[in-house]
Amino acid sequence: TENLYIEGDNLDVLKLLQESYLGKVKMIYIDPPYNTGNDFIYKDDFTQSASEYAEDRGSFDDEGNRMFKNTDTNGRFHSDWCSMIYSRLLLSRNLLTDDGVIFISIDENEVNTLKTICDEVFGESNFIAELIWSAGRKNDSKYISVSHEYILCYFKNAQYIKEHQIIWREKKQGLDNIYA
């Protein structure tokens, strides 16, 4: 197989890959920003201040009164992140073969939001599993140590997998003798 290394903004690269790799990629693994606000070399904090969010979304009526009260639970913490991940997942889906699969790493901050977006992009019926893996423990947590992360798995087309009887697991030798 040929290897390809492309450096650039991932959205631009995904758009570029559409030309040559549309429907040709068997498996994709992505590890997107977790929206934690930590100091990484890439943007990992997609929150806006309450005033920025209110201004952008037209959250005041004609008299200048706020149209919602609880600024800590509104979309300003997720809207930009959702827009960022949604567009990239759509482009990634286009690259997958009909029997292709995507794995997406995430932590507890956005796993539920990501699942909702993936259900829309890939379809709920194409959901395979939510894998939970044990991460390293530093034993420096203030209250409780979160020691796992998630990997969401989706088929591009589960119906294609069924119709073509594609097997992900094979029976182990001797298993029939045990259960006979």
Can you say where each PLM-predicted feature lies in the sequence?
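Core catalytic lobe of class I
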Residues: 1-180
